[in-house]
């Protein structure tokens, strides 16, 4: 990831919206900048990652069926860039909207294992309901 120069508010996608395979999104976080760990960055970091199909992510050479409809995969088939330890909970922003939340993975930046994100659009109704309750 490289340093991120500004922070802004990003809206959520509509219920059930999805980004097509190959769409390039941006993940941001304060986590480790290398798979081996090491010192955490002193600035917010960001990386551009393409959306990976559920079929590829669920292949026997990757997550072998463990990816559900509530998840999004993103990363390069060559590896090299990814969210990593300490980035969990951070946003995956696509077209200016928070489509994913950093969830889990197998190592970091491994070409066989894209990063796994919670699919925000699958929970949009719940987010709206909770927001309405909080405003009462």
Regions found by a protein language model. Give the residues of each.
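Extracellular "complement/coagulation-type" protease architecture
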Residues: 1-136
């Amino acid at each position: 990831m490289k340093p991120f120069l500004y922070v802004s508010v990003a809206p959520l996608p509509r219920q059930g919206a999805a980004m097509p395979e190959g769409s390039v999104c941006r993940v941001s976080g304060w986590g480790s900048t290398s798979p081996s760990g090491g010192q955490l960055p002193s600035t917010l970091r960001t990386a551009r990652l393409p959306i990976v199909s559920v079929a590829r992510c669920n292949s026997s050479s990757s997550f072998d069926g463990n990816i559900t409809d509530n998840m999004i995969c993103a990363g390069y088939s060559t590896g090299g860039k990814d969210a990593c330890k300490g980035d969990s909970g951070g946003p995956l922003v696509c077209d200016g909207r928070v489509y994913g939340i950093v969830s889990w993975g197998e190592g970091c930046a491994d070409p066989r294992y894209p990063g796994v994100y919670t699919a925000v659009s699958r929970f949009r109704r719940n987010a709206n309901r909770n927001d309405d309750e909080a405003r009462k």
